[in-house]
A protein has these predicted regions:
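Hard-cation-handling environments
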Residues: 229-374, 387-389, 437-439, 444-447, ...
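Charged, amphipathic alpha-helical linkers/stalks
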Residues: 459-526
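Short, surface-exposed amphipathic charged segments that create phosphate/polyanion-binding patches used
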Residues: 150-154, 287-295, 415-416, 465-477
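Short, solvent-exposed amphipathic alpha-helical segments in soluble enzyme
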Residues: 20-22, 43, 168-171, 196-199, ...
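Short, compositionally biased "basic patch" segments
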Residues: 191-206, 292-299, 370-396
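C-terminal, active-site-flanking charged/polar segments
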Residues: 359, 434-479
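His/Asp/Glu-rich metal-coordinating catalytic cores
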Residues: 1-55, 60, 64, 71-252, ...
C-alpha cells in the first residue's frame, strides 16, 4: 500500500499521483503542465498498459491533459469522475487535441522550409477520442466499490462545475487507510456552483496550496462595477471586450450580466447584445445548463425554481462558426464580447483585440489571472503597442482588471477546509503550489492545527500502511525546458516520440498476454501465431 508523488510537487500544474494497493495500480489525476517546470517530474513507475484505472478530480487540463497520452501508451482501463466532469472533459480534451494538431501543422510548415524532419505530436485526435470513451461518471456522495479493498466517494470541491475532492478507502491484509485528495478547493460565494464541502476524517490528506500564502481580501461587488463599465463603454459607442477562460469564468460573467439586465442597471441601450465567441465556451455553457440539479448553488437553484435560467438572457448571442465570429466586428452596434483565451495568447480573442485595442471608445476587461509573458499580462502592464497577426496595434482602449476573481480558495479558505477534520490526520502532504508556497502552507498547518505536514518532491514514495517514507527525494532543478516538451507524460523515454509509442505498444502486448493466461489452448495458439507472424514481418 504505497503512494508515489509525481506531478504538481512544488509546482502548480501537472497533478499526478501513483498508487499501489489491494493488488491494483492506479493514478489520481493525470494532468499536463502547460508551461516550463522548475523541477524534474519523475515518470510513472509502470507502463501505462499495466494501470488498472484512473481517478480524476476535475476537468481542467492541468489535471486531465495527459489522459490521451496515457491512452496512446496503451492504457485501456476505466477513468472515474463526476458526471459533469465527464461532460466537460469530453469537450476540453477534444479542444486540447485540436490545438496540439494545429500547432504541429504550423511547426511542420516551418520545419519543411528549413529542411528539418516533421514534428510528431505525442498523441493524436484518435487517442483523445479513445480515452474519452473510457470516462465513467460517479455522482457526488455515492460510496462506490471499485474492486476488493478499494472504495471511493466524491465530495463537491466548489472549484469548477463537477469538481471533486476524493475520499479513498484502501484495505490490505485487514488494514484500512483512508486518503483524502483535496483536488482544487474552490473559493466561497462563487456564482452558480456550490461552496466547497468540508471533509470529516482521513488518515492521510493530499492537499493543494495554490494560494496557501495569501488572502484574496474583501470580495468586491462585481455586478455594479461591471454595470458601470458596460454603461460607460456603450455610451462612448465602443465595445466591451472580455478575454475569458471558456469553462467556468465565461459562465460567471453571463451570470453577472443576466442580473445587470434583470435589474436594468444599464440605461439607454435596451437589450444590448452580448456575444459569447468561443465554440468551447458555447459547449461548456450548454453543459452548465445540463448539470444544474447536481451542481448549482442555492441562489442559482432559486432562480431555476422561478423559471429563470441563471446564464441565459435576452440579447445573448452564441457564436460558433468562423463566419459568425468575423461578423461580430462588422456590426457597428456597441456590444459586449466574451471570448477565449483568457490570457489572449490564442483563440478568437486576438481578432477582437485587433479590432478594438486601437479604439478609444472600447474597453478591454480582464477577469482572470494573466501569466508572465502573455499578451494579457503585457496589456495590464501598460503596453502602448502590441503585435497581433504580424501587425503593430496601438493600445488606445481602456484597459481594466477586476481584482479578486479566483476559483481557488485563499489561505483562510484552505485552513478552514483542513480544519474541518474531526481528528488529526497521520500526515498531510502539501502539493499544487509554487515552490515556497507549499513549504509556507505546510508550516501553517503545523502552527494552526499541529498537523504533521510536509511538501514532497516528485519521486517521493510513502508506505501508507506503515506511515513511513520508502523514498524521500529532493527537487532536481531543470536548467532549461521548452514549452514544447513541458506538457509531455513522464515515462521512460528514448527521446523519439514515435519509437516511444512503439515501445508502449509492446508493453501493452505483454500486458494482454499476461491477462490471457488460463485461456483456451486453441485461442492461445492462434494468438501466438499472430504475434509470430507480426514479428516475422518486422524482424529485420
Amino acid at each position: 500500500m504505497r503512494l508515489t508523488f509525481l506531478g504538481a510537487t512544488h509546482e502548480v500544474t501537472g497533478s499526478c499521483y501513483y498508487l499501489e494497493a489491494a493488488g491494483k495500480k492506479f493514478l489520481v489525476d493525470c494532468g499536463r503542465a502547460p508551461g516550463p517546470n522548475s523541477y524534474e517530474t519523475k515518470p510513472i513507475p509502470v507502463p501505462a498498459s499495466q494501470l488498472d484505472f484512473v481517478l480524476i478530480t476535475h476537468a481542467h487540463i492541468d489535471h486531465t491533459g495527459n489522459l490521451p497520452l496515457l491512452y496512446a501508451h496503451g492504457f485501456r482501463g476505466p477513468i472515474y469522475m463526476t458526471p459533469a466532469t465527464v461532460a466537460l472533459s469530453d469537450i476540453m480534451l477534444r479542444d486540447s487535441a485540436h490545438i496540439q494538431l494545429a500547432e504541429a501543422e504550423w511547426r511542420n510548415r516551418k520545419n519543411r522550409r528549413a529542411g528539418k524532419e516533421d514534428y510528431v505530436t505525442p498523441y493524436t485526435m484518435e487517442d483523445a477520442l479513445g480515452v474519452i470513451r473510457l470516462l465513467e461518471g460517479i455522482p457526488y456522495h455515492q460510496r462506490v466499490t471499485l474492486s476488493d479493498g478499494i472504495q471511493i466517494r466524491f465530495l463537491d470541491a466548489g472549484h469548477l462545475l463537477g469538481s471533486a475532492s476524493i475520499e479513498l478507502w484502501l484495505t490490505e491484509d485487514g488494514v484500512t487507510k483512508k486518503l483524502l485528495f483535496s483536488g482544487d478547493i474552490g473559493n466561497i460565494h462563487q456564482p452558480l456552483i456550490n461552496d466547497p464541502e468540508y471533509p470529516e476524517s482521513a488518515d492521510y490528506v493530499i492537499m493543494e496550496s495554490t494560494y496557501g500564502d495569501r488572502s484574496h481580501g474583501p470580495k468586491p461587488d462585481y455586478v455594479p462595477e461591471l454595470a458601470k463599465i458596460i454603461q460607460e463603454t456603450l455610451d462612448r459607442g465602443g465595445n466591451l471586450v472580455i478575454p475569458s477562460f471558456a469553462v467556468g469564468r465565461t459562465q460567471e460573467m453571463l451570470y453577472f450580466i443576466r442580473e445587470i439586465k434583470a435589474e436594468h442597471l444599464v440605461h439607454g441601450h435596451g437589450e444590448f447584445p452580448v456575444y459569447v465567441d468561443s465554440p468551447l465556451a458555447v459547449e461548456a455553457t450548454n453543459i452548465f445548463r445540463d448539470h444544474q440539479k447536481e451542481c448549482y448553488d442555492s441562489d442559482a437553484a432559486a432562480l431555476l425554481a422561478q423559471g429563470i435560467n441563471p446564464i441565459l438572457f435576452p440579447g445573448l448571442k452564441l457564436s460558433i462558426t468562423s463566419d459568425e465570429s468575423k461578423a461580430i466586428n462588422f456590426n457597428e452596434t456597441p456590444k459586449v464580447i466574451i471570448s477565449a483565451s483568457g490570457m489572449c495568447d490564442a483563440g478568437r480573442i486576438k481578432h477582437h483585440l485587433k479590432h478594438n485595442l486601437w479604439r478609444q471608445e472600447s474597453t478591454v476587461l480582464f477577469v482572470g489571472y494573466q501569466a508572465v509573458g502573455t499578451l494579457g499580462r503585457a496589456l495590464i502592464g501598460g503596453a502602448k503597442e502590441v503585435k497581433l497577426f504580424q501587425e503593430e496595434v496601438h493600445v488606445n482602449a481602456h484597459i481594466i482588471q477586476f481584482p479578486g476573481m479566483s476559483g481557488h480558495a485563499d489561505q483562510e479558505g484552505l485552513l478552514k477546509w483542513a480544519g474541518s477534520l474531526r481528528a488529526k490526520p497521520d500526515r498531510v502532504f502539501v502539493t499544487h503550489g509554487e515552490d515556497k508556497v507549499t513549504e509556507i502552507f505546510a508550516e501553517k498547518l503545523w502552527d494552526e492545527f499541529r498537523y504533521p505536514a510536509m511538501a514532497p518532491f516528485s519521486g517521493t514514495v510513502f508506505d501508507l500502511k506503515e506511515n513511513e517514507f520508502i523514498e524521500k527525494t529532493v527537487g532536481i532543478p531543470i536548467q532549461k525546458e521548452t514549452t514544447a516538451n513541458a506538457g509531455t507524460l513522464r515515462t521512460r523515454s528514448s527521446g523519439n516520440a514515435v519509437f516511444d509509442r512503439l515501445v508502449a505498444a509492446g508493453q501493452r502486448l505483454l500486458t494482454v498476454i499476461t491477462r490471457n493466461k488460463g485461456g483456451a489452448n486453441k485461442d492461445l495458439s492462434k494468438f501466438a501465431d499472430q504475434i509470430n507472424s507480426l514479428c516475422d514481418k518486422w524482424d529485420r
